[in-house]
Amino acid sequence: MSASGRSAREKLNFQLGLRRRGISDQAVLRALEDVPREQFVEPHDKEVAYADTALGIACGQTISQPYVVAYMTEQLRTHPRHRALEIGTGSGYQAAVLSRLCRQVVTVERYRTLADTARARLAALGCRNVEVVVGDGYDVPDTLGTFDRIIVTAAMETIPDSLMERLEPDGIMLVPVGPPEGVQQLVRLRKGADGVEQEDLIPVRFVPALVGLAKEL
């Protein structure tokens, strides 16, 4: 089978697998179909880009397994008018998916190497509504404004007040909460008029969100 034929089959199996596991939002499925995941993995991993497993990328980080990306994106409940913030750009894949679903995406990455690589990938795909920022996810500056949706793609032991302040009223935040090693809980927060409602979703495993900018890389 040719490489193009194999790729088409892998993408079909990828979509069918997501549907079998309960991903049903058509906009999310279209976004995942539209974004070529193989362009966000390391060259030696291109043949397994659509396997349902996390893959290593630069700076000791990972690109999350496809089901987790799909699940988190669906649970974020995006709308085309939304402005979204991502903490932990990584490969840029999650930001690319969100770019198909939201008006604007701002993604914050502590590693300059990852930020530069993701920025180039996103530009190559024509994701003009994505801004990549080198910064500290624990200290998001006021200058970035507020957001309808926030997604954190690294584990936090506690959610910083500075991040909650970036969330608009009626906004939704998804964040893995728990220890840096072991299993965390994916939590959905909704900022309502009477305070913040918290809902536990599924157990997950993410690399830890670290404080500050990386001194190297």
Swiss-Prot record:
> Would the keyword Metal-binding be found if you checked this record's keyword annotation?
no
Q: Which reaction does it catalyse?
A: [protein]-L-isoaspartate + S-adenosyl-L-methionine = [protein]-L-isoaspartate alpha-methyl ester + S-adenosyl-L-homocysteine
Q: Which GO terms describe its cellular component?
A: cytoplasm
Indicate where this protein resides in the cell: Cytoplasm
Q: Which UniProt keywords apply?
A: Cytoplasm, Methyltransferase, S-adenosyl-L-methionine, Transferase
Highest taxon of source = Bacteria
Q: Does the keyword Cytoplasm apply?
A: yes
Q: Which Gene3D superfamilies match?
A: Vaccinia Virus protein VP39
Instruction: Please report a single Pfam family linked to this protein.
Output: PCMT
Active site as annotated: 64
Q: What is its EC number?
A: 2.1.1.77
Q: Name one GO molecular function term.
A: protein-L-isoaspartate (D-aspartate) O-methyltransferase activity
One GO process term, biological-process aspect: protein repair
- The main location class comes to cytoplasm
The similarity annotation says:
Belongs to the methyltransferase superfamily. L-isoaspartyl/D-aspartyl protein methyltransferase family.
Which PANTHER family does its entry note? Answer: PROTEIN-L-ISOASPARTATE O-METHYLTRANSFERASE (PTHR11579), PROTEIN-L-ISOASPARTATE(D-ASPARTATE) O-METHYLTRANSFERASE (PTHR11579:SF0)
Question: What biological function has been recorded for the protein in this entry?
Answer: Catalyzes the methyl esterification of L-isoaspartyl residues in peptides and proteins that result from spontaneous decomposition of normal L-aspartyl and L-asparaginyl residues. It plays a role in the repair and/or degradation of damaged proteins.
Q: Which HAMAP family match?
A: PIMT
The record, for NCBIfam families, names: pimt (TIGR00080), PRK00312.1 (NF001453)
Q: What is this protein called?
A: Protein-L-isoaspartate O-methyltransferase
Q: What is the lineage of its organism?
A: Bacteria, Pseudomonadati, Pseudomonadota, Alphaproteobacteria, Hyphomicrobiales
